[in-house]
């Protein structure tokens, strides 16, 4: 008897949102949920998307907390994005640097609070100081910042603390599940 191929179903409408849910969801089930999404994409006929999702790495705890906070409180993430943009503009001479840095500190505090709350809500409390230090390092690293803004940061602990280094604009084209990395 000939094997009948399953008819592919339609691919998820917004893969980026699904990946953000994956990174913002419970850490212990990350691999199970990632693999389920990859199977869903493969069943829908999206082999490229399935391979890209399957290749996604499980985040480390502090990076996951930042992702979870960003996913749970998109407003905090938007404020961080706006504050980073404000600092970059002010560093270029187009504004009040001190005011922009104050706004960045407030935005960082908001996202750290969201991360700590989201992690606790998932039953995985994290150290507020460690999350704050990690966020400062992320803000100073364009690739890591782009990943956080896309809610898919994997590792913040490996980043050096930038100290008083300038804030970097996020790298363009980073953080897509199916994009050309």
Say what each PLM segment does.
Residues 1-25, 32, 42-43, 169-181:
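Actinobacteria-biased recognition of intrinsically disordered, low-complexity terminal regions
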Residues 11, 29, 56-60, 79-81:
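Short acidic alpha-helix initiation/capping motifs at coil-to-helix transition points
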Residues 23, 69-70, 75-180:
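Amphipathic alpha-helical coiled-coil/helical-stalk segments
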Residues 33-75, 86-94, 118-121:
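N-terminal interaction modules that seed assembly of large macromolecular complexes
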């Amino acid at each position: 008897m000939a094997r009948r191929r399953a008819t592919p179903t339609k691919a998820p409408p917004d893969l980026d949102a699904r990946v953000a849910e994956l990174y913002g969801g419970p850490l212990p089930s990350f691999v199970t949920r990632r693999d389920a999404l990859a199977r869903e994409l493969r069943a829908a006929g999206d082999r490229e998307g399935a391979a890209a999702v399957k290749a996604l790495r499980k985040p480390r705890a502090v990076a996951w907390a930042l992702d979870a906070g960003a996913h749970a409180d998109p407003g905090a993430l938007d404020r961080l994005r706006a504050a980073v943009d404000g600092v970059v503009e002010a560093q270029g001479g187009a504004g009040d640097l001190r005011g922009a840095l104050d706004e960045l500190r407030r935005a960082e505090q908001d996202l750290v609070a969201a991360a700590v709350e989201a992690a606790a809500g998932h039953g995985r409390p994290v150290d507020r100081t460690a999350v704050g230090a990690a966020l400062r390092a992320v803000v100073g690293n364009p690739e890591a910042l782009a990943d956080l803004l896309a809610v898919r940061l994997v590792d913040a602990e490996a980043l050096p603390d930038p100290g008083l280094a300038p804030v970097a604009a996020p790298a363009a084209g980073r953080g897509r599940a199916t994009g050309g990395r």
